């Protein structure tokens, strides 16, 4: 918002600023637009409110000026009046219904503005009209916050008298007290405290009043707070006390006051830093550091990372502070948890003067730090030659003459070739750092240029990886081998070819926010890397050398997109064509395409004759570029004749399939426009899928439109007969579906199971898609039955999957379709899959028409619900008059179905709520009790027994003359046998094999016969013909005891699952599998 010229304003505004009432009246009589807007949407009324001329304002208001007009900042004339502190203008605006709750873009009301601008009279006029004085602006501040911020005692007092809350917090949980303390408004602070404000309040980050006052150096506020009993060592959320804050910001006067008041000079924060650490590192903390040292601060206190105050001073090279610390006993060689001493830190950040001080005071230059590095490692790694020289001059043992110059260099008192824990010497670090002066100093001091690290790399490998031309020249001139391979088989040439990737970042170079400023530096580095590669090639580096994976330098240059490096390698290599075309392990063309390096790819494409070489998976470079979505690479390859129809080996996808599946529309467009084949859009993969099908499966609408516009066949089917429309129905993409229908896709196409897209949309619950398909189907073939090859309709599928919206739509569309197709009705489908919502909808819509319907085997929905143990389904069916004792073609009721399948909940419901008949017999004369026992379902059998005392039911025999006791005994159901015996089951009844229930326990017929012979010899009872009615009655009454005797006999096994007699057709368990 700039300053506008008054001459550019409308005449009415000019007259207002001139305070010319008559001119204003004249302009208004001439029908001048009273609500005319300037560039910032301010009206003449805004101007009048700002100027504060009451007569003009009154004239404008009487002439119909908009009293609540808002400018671009949403400020109203009332805001302007409050800002100008003109209570008369404000009162006039209020009298003309100005909105007292109007908010600007910062959500500030006129009261906020009045409080911020010390407009006490305006605030007094506004306060009674507001429901609350604590309304917050966008930052959460109330009018009291603004009044305190302005430091106007009268306004603060007024707001408090009118009921403003003392402890209201902004979005950072700062109270008005925080602002009074921070800005040094002592009288305001005292007033707030006198009114009951909490001196111990903290904001969201735990800053108290003492912290805020210390931060801004408000010494008088600090003294007042200390007098009022403020906790002097109270930490904030980061563990910092007020003394930490004062030392960090260089507020030495506050620090003195705090120390004199007894602040703990050694209290650590959450990271273990004391105020002395903070003073040592801060910009303006020199006086604070001296104060702390003189008041007993521990100069050797270590943080959680082991850093002492001397470490902190070394980071920024605080020379004077370091001297003070050393003079007061700071340990010179104190190591942090990484092993770094202050000398390591000073070397890392290039503070030569501090290094001199530390060395003068006995710092150990041979001390190992991070990764077992010397300080010299760090100095040369980060390119500080002066520090390197200083460290080399320490502990002089002998003097040698440099081979490169006549300069005498003093050798260090440690072995310069000592490696770190990764085997890297100082020369490796210098080569990586790229400072040739450091490199020369080390070489002249006897550094071994052939020394290898643990990865087998020489210093030349590191120089090449960082593209350092001067270092490479120095090392090669000194005798470094240009073709030496590391553990991966890589020569320096491999790393030089990819030097932009391996180049070490420059941590001491500040990063620029402007990419244009970085570009010259990047270009300079690219040139240097190119010169480095060129130098290596000129000095015997072999471009045909392969690493252990089979990659040459050409592969590396292609993989990392260094076009100039690649061109140079191709030019210098005698067998470059063989390297480029080799696909073992992967060709350079594939590497460039995969990584999206179009410039490198273009270079290779211009060199190669065949661009359709394939990798071990059968993928071409064009396939990889398309799959990765690199449009520029696709454009390069297609322009040079790469084929879009070559298929990879696994799924037989072409680049078109890859583009469509990934949604790369631009790449797909380029592939189609290559014009390789007229039907290129209909090429199929191993499963018969076209690119159109894959685009729809993945919801890529743009690709779908493009393929259809380019002639893709909408009705093409895969090997299972499924078209793009089938896939659209499954994914539910309405836009894709609409595009297909616009291109005349056949809506009633069927797959290999006879299912149409309508079936799939119903099964997947896509209501909008289903509606569209049903409308299209009406116009295609309104008489189509709409059932698949198994006789199932879309209504069956919607019911089975529980999509009630789809079912509702289908019922509206064709209410009698439930009669079509498979007699296993939609209601059967809903209850067998526990879909309560669709069950309820079908019963509500069709009721008696469907509730007792039967499938091909005579089973009702009640049978299906019982089979699935669907109690809620059973309840709803019975509420709609389902026949509880209805039998299927085998004579079984729903209860018998539940009992046979062990569905305990269903059995319980049908017995207790449904009152199902237990005496119903199936075609083999089995009761529900027989069936429960035959499948070993103890709980179901016991439930049935708990509901009956009928001896006829308990001793009922099926067509094989077996009682429930025979079957329970055969299956080892001890608890059921006991219950049967307690209910009076006879133990002497024989089945058609002549076996009693006791003999039914035998594992097979032969064992049963043997057991019968033994028992007959033992003769525990009178012969059969001699048994009197009395003795039979006695046996019956003693059946429990008899059962216990048999059960306790170890000779008779329990739980045997094999029947002792051959199963007869139609005996127990027939049709036991309830499947459709």
Curated annotation (Swiss-Prot):
It comes from the Eukaryota. InterPro entries: Ankyrin_rpt (IPR002110), Ankyrin_rpt-contain_sf (IPR036770), Dendritic_Spine_Reg/Scaffold (IPR050889). Coiled coil: none annotated. ANK repeats lie at residues 7-36, 40-69, 73-102, 106-135, 139-168, 172-201, 205-234, 238-267, 271-301, 305-334, 338-367, 371-400, 422-451, 455-484, 488-545, 549-579, 584-613, 617-646, 651-680, 687-716, 720-749, 753-782, 790-819, 822-852, 857-886, 890-920, 924-953, 960-989. It holds the Pfam family Ank_4. The keyword Transmembrane does not apply. PROSITE patterns: ANK_REP_REGION, ANK_REPEAT. Keywords: ANK repeat, Phosphoprotein, Repeat. Residues 502-522 are annotated as: Disordered. The modification Phosphoserine is found at residues 1028, 1075. Residues 502-514 have a biased composition (Basic and acidic residues). Protein phosphatase 6 (PP6) holoenzyme is proposed to be a heterotrimeric complex formed by the catalytic subunit, a SAPS domain-containing subunit (PP6R) and an ankyrin repeat-domain containing regulatory subunit (ARS). Interacts with PPP6R1. Putative regulatory subunit of protein phosphatase 6 (PP6) that may be involved in the recognition of phosphoprotein substrates. This is Serine/threonine-protein phosphatase 6 regulatory ankyrin repeat subunit C. The lineage of its organism: Eukaryota, Metazoa, Chordata, Craniata, Vertebrata. The gene is ANKRD52.
């Amino acid at each position: 918002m700039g300053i506008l010229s008054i001459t550019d304003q409308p005449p009415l505004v000019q007259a207002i600023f001139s305070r010319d009432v008559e001119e204003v009246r004249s302009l208004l009589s001439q029908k001048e637009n009273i609500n005319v807007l300037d560039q910032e949407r301010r009206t003449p009324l805004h101007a009048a409110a700002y100027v504060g001329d009451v007569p003009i304002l009154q004239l404008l208001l009487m002439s119909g000026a908009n009293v609540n007009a808002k400018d671009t900042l949403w400020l109203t004339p009332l805001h302007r009046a409050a800002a100008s502190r003109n209570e008369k203008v404000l009162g006039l605006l209020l009298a003309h219904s100005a909105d007292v709750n109007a908010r600007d873009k910062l959500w500030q009301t006129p009261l906020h503005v009045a409080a911020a601008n010390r407009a006490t009279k305006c605030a007094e006029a506004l306060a009674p009209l507001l429901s609350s004085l604590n309304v917050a602006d966008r930052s959460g501040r109330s009018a009291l916050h603004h009044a305190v911020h302005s430091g106007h005692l009268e306004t603060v007092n007024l707001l408090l008298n009118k009921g403003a809350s003392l402890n209201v917090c902004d979005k950072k949980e700062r109270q008005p007290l925080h602002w009074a303390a921070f800005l040094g408004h002592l009288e305001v602070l005292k007033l707030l405290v006198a009114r009951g404000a909490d001196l111990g309040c903290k904001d969201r980050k735990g800053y108290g009043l003492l912290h805020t006052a210390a931060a801004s150096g408000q010494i008088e506020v600090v003294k007042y707070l200390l007098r009022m009993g403020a906790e002097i060592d109270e930490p904030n959320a980061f563990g910092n006390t007020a003394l930490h804050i004062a030392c960090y910001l260089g507020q030495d006067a506050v620090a003195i006051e705090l120390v004199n008041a007894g602040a703990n000079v050694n209290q650590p924060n959450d990271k273990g830093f004391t105020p002395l650490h903070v003073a040592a590192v801060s910009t303006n903390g020199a006086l604070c550091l001296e104060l702390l040292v003189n008041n007993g601060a521990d100069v050797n206190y270590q943080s959680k990372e082991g850093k002492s105050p001397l470490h902190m001073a070394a980071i920024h090279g605080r020379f004077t502070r370091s001297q003070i610390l050393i003079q007061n006993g700071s340990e010179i060689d104190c190591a942090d948890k990484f092993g770094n001493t202050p000398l390591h830190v000073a070397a890392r950040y290039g503070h030569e003067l501090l290094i001199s001080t530390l060395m003068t005071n006995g710092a150990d230059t041979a001390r190992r730090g991070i990764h077992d590095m010397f300080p010299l490692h760090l100095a040369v790694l980060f390119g500080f030659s002066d520090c390197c020289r200083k460290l080399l001059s320490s502990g002089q043992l002998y003097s040698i003459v440099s081979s490169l110059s006549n300069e005498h260099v003093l050798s260090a008192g440690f072995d310069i070739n000592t490696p770190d824990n990764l085997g890297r010497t100082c020369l490796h670090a210098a080569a990586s750092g790229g400072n040739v002066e450091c490199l020369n100093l080390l070489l002249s001091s006897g550094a071994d240029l052939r020394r290898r690290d643990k990865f087998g790399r020489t210093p030349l490998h590191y120089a090449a990886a960082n593209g350092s031309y001067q270092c490479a020249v120095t090392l090669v001139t000194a005798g470094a081998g240009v073709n030496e391979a590391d553990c991966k088989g890589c020569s320096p040439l491999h790393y030089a070819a990819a030097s932009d990737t391996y180049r070490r970042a420059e941590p001491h170079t500040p990063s620029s926010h402007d990419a244009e400023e970085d570009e010259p530096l990047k270009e300079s580095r690219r040139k240097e890397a190119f010169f480095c590669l060129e130098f290596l090639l000129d000095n015997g580096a072999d471009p045909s050398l392969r690493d252990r994976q089979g990659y040459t330098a050409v592969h590396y240059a292609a993989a990392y997109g260094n076009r100039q490096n690649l061109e140079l390698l191709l030019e210098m290599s005698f067998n470059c064509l063989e390297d480029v075309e080799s696909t073992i392990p992967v060709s350079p063309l594939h590497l460039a395409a995969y990584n999206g390096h179009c410039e490198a790819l273009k270079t290779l494409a211009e060199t190669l004759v065949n661009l359709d070489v394939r990798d071990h998976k059968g993928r071409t470079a064009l396939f990889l570029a398309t799959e990765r979505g690199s449009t520029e690479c696709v454009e390069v390859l297609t322009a040079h004749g790469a084929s879009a129809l070559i298929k990879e080996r696994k799924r037989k996808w072409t680049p078109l399939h890859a583009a469509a599946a990934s949604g790369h529309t631009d790449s797909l467009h380029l592939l189609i426009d290559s014009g390789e084949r007229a039907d290129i859009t209909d090429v199929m993969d191993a499963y018969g899928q076209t690119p159109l099908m894959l685009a729809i499966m993945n919801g890529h609408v743009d690709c779908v439109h493009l393929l259809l516009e380019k002639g893709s066949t909408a009705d093409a089917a895969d090997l299972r007969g499924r078209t793009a429309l089938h896939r659209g129905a499954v994914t539910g993409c309405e836009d894709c579906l609409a595009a297909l229908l616009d291109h005349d896709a056949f809506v009633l196409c069927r797959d290999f199971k006879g299912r149409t897209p309508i079936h799939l949309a119903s099964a997947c619950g896509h209501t909008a898609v289903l509606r569209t398909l049903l409308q299209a189907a009406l116009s295609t073939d309104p008489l189509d039955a709409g059932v698949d090859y198994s006789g199932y309709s879309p209504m069956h599928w919607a019911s089975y999957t529980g999509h009630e919206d789809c079912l509702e739509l289908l019922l509206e569309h064709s209410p009698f379709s439930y009669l079509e197709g498979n007699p296993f009705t939609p209601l059967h489908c809903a209850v067998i899959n526990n879909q309560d919502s669709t069950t309820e909808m079908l019963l509500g819509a069709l009721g008696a028409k469907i509730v007792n319907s039967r499938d091909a085997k005579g089973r009702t929905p009640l049978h299906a619900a019982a089979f699935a143990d669907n109690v809620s389904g059973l309840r709803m069916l019975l509420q709609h008059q389902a026949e509880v004792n209805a039998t299927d073609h085998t004579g079984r009721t729903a209860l018998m179905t539940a009992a046979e399948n062990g569905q305990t909940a269903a059995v319980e419901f049908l017995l207790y709520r449904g009152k199902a008949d237990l005496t119903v017999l199936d075609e083999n004369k089995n009761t529900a009790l027989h069936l429960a026992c035959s499948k070993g379902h103890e709980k179901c059998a016991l439930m049935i027994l708990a509901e009956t005392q009928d001896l006829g039911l308990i001793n009922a025999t099926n067509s094989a003359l077996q009682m429930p006791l025979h079957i329970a005994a055969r299956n080892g159901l001890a608890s059921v046998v006991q219950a049967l015996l307690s209910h009076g089951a006879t133990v002497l009844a024989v089945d058609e094999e002549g076996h009693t229930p006791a003999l039914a326990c035998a594992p097979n017929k032969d064992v049963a016969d043997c057991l019968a012979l033994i028992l007959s010899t033992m003769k525990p009872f009178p012969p059969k013909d001699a048994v009197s009615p009395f003795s039979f009655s006695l046996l019956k009454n003693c059946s429990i005891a008899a059962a216990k005797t048999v059960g306790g006999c170890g000779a008779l096994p329990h739980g045997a699952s094999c029947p002792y007699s051959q199963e007869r057709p139609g005996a127990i368990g027939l049709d036991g599998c309830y499947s459709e």
